[in-house]
């Protein structure tokens, strides 16, 4: 893989900038936008980027910093999921606390934002508090966004519980976007000034990249990733007016800036230290780019992946047509087609060939194809059958290719497949027998105990991490679980494999 990003250069630049900004205030509330860890969007767009580089950054600051974690009450109530891990935001919040503690970072507490006495939220608070985690409620801000006098008052920010902190840098982060980090920072600063303390605010957000062009594929990829939030990149008009320099920001920050200035002046009874939304930021990610063309190409691929994902979400009823159309507009702006993702055509061709040959499942009435692009660029395909899903077949064919094992040699013994099929159909009565990818991986592990070829192939599974995968039909939960464990970047066409509304298939 060609690298487009230098983590060490970025870490040096970023830590210096945060320390410099913290030096301007007695205490700095630093809003960490995006994902604090496992930032796979950045890793996909910036080849070479460490998905956990922000944790490494915090480790360099751990003697000066502590963490407040925010989570929106509505996300807890509706069990919002992280698509890349398949876990809920509340579970991710607990995982994040564990990970931060394991790195020696102090987690001061969890702030539940826009709390409305939801039972699920109360249960979540009780669970955390019984495990020794401090939890605070913040409420919908009275008067927001028009009435600054009410916002900056005891019934506005003053109504929120104050989180007592000790370190000069307070990192305010969250499992995902829309969690109330900005409001939490301002509420904390309100309480600081009420107590006679001086505190400041800055924003650390990787995207959009302020010092890259508005139409750079990396910035467009960010917009594609946040379509559900209705984010749009734009030139920062305040920065242009103040400095005569064109920088990129996004609509929410630009729209909120006049309000921030008014709130800041009301809270501190002084002038705002920032002349633009760009001024507020401390992002140095653009300075870590070492090969612009590599980053451009990777970002173009991310835009295609996002479009394919929104098509599937629409088919599931999880998003609206506007989101699909917006994703298509972004793809068109870069002159892209879905076929520019090479595994797309390969998967479709595999399905077509299977259909012509009368292969597939249920006598050829259900035909699916899958394709994997290996790290060396080779494409390996798989087709579904009565024995296994297309994703499972493609993965097994991929590890055969990597191991130099002839295609005719079976990796999972027929007796294992037959035993699993018997259990599923005759004992568990699940109504289907073919192995999904997750089941096939277990079958491969069992076979490896007696089959040397399976043992060799199993050792190659780690080489599939980061490989591109496409399937011609919507991915089942069992295939998703396997692909996530392997670390593959997968997409699919927005079609169900059958017309059945429910078939129990995993």
Give names to the regions the model predicted.
Residues 1-171, 188-354, 358, 366-367, ...:
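Flexible phosphate-sensing "switch/lid" loops adjacent to ATP/NTP-binding sites
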Residues 173-175:
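Residues at the beta-strand->loop junction immediately N-terminal to the Walker
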Residues 177-179:
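Short strand->helix junction
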Residues 184:
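Hydrophobic positions on the alpha1 helix immediately C-terminal to the Walker A/P-loop
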Residues 383-384:
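Short clusters of small/polar residues that mark proteolytic maturation junctions
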Residues 387-403:
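A short, polar/charged loop-to-alpha-helix boundary motif
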Residues 401-433:
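Short HxH-centered metal-ligating active-site micro-motif
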């Amino acid at each position: 893989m060609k690298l487009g990003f230098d983590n060490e250069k970025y870490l040096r630049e970023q830590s210096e900038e945060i320390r410099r900004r913290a030096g301007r205030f007695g205490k700095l509330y630093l809003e960490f936008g995006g994902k604090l860890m496992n930032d796979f969007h950045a890793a996909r767009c910036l080849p070479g980027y460490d998905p956990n580089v922000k944790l490494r950054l915090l480790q360099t600051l751990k003697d000066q910093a502590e963490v407040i974690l925010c989570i929106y009450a509505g996300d807890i109530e509706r069990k919002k999921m992280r698509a890349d891990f398949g876990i809920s935001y509340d579970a991710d919040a607990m995982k994040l606390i564990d990970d931060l503690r394991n790195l020696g970072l102090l987690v001061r507490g969890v702030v539940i934002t826009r709390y409305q006495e939801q039972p699920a939220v109360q249960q979540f608070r009780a669970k955390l508090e019984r495990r020794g985690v401090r939890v605070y409620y913040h409420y919908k801000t009275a008067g927001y966004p028009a009435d600054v006098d009410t916002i900056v008052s005891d019934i506005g920010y003053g109504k929120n519980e104050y989180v007592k902190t000790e370190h000069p840098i307070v990192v305010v982060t969250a499992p995902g976007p829309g969690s109330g980090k900005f409001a939490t920072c301002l509420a904390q600063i309100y309480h600081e000034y009420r107590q006679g303390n001086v505190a400041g605010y800055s924003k650390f957000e990787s995207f959009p990249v302020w010092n890259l062009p508005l139409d750079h594929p990396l910035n467009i990829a960010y917009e594609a990733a946040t379509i559900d939030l209705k984010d749009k990149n734009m030139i920062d008009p305040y920065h242009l007016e103040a400095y005569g320099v064109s920088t990129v920001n996004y609509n929410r920050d630009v729209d909120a800036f006049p309000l921030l200035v008014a709130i800041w002046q009301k809270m501190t009874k002084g002038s705002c230290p920032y002349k633009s939304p760009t001024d507020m930021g401390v992002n140095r990610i653009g300075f870590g780019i070492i090969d612009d063309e590599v980053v451009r190409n990777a970002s173009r691929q991310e835009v295609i992946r996002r479009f394919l994902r929104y098509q599937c979400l629409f088919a599931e009823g999880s998003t609206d047509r506007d989101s699909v159309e917006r994703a298509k507009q972004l793809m068109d702006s870069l002159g892209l087609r879905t076929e520019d993702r090479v595994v797309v055509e390969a998967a479709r061709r595999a399905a077509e060939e299977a259909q012509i040959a009368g292969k597939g499942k249920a006598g050829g009435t259900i035909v699916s194809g899958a394709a994997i692009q290996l790290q060396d660029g080779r494409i390996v395909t798989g087709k579904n059958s009565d024995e296994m899903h297309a994703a499972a077949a493609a993965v097994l064919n991929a590890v055969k290719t990597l191991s130099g094992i002839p295609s005719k040699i079976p990796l999972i013994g027929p007796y294992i497949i037959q035993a699993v099929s018997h259990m599923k159909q005759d004992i568990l009565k699940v109504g289907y027998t073919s192995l999904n990818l997750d089941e096939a991986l277990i079958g491969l592990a069992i076979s490896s105990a007696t089959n040397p070829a399976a043992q060799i192939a199993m050792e190659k599974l780690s080489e599939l991490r980061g490989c591109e995968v496409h399937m011609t039909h919507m991915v089942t939960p069992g295939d998703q679980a396997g692909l996530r464990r392997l670390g593959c970047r997968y997409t699919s066409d927005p079609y169900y494999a059958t017309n059945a509304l429910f078939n129990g298939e995993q």
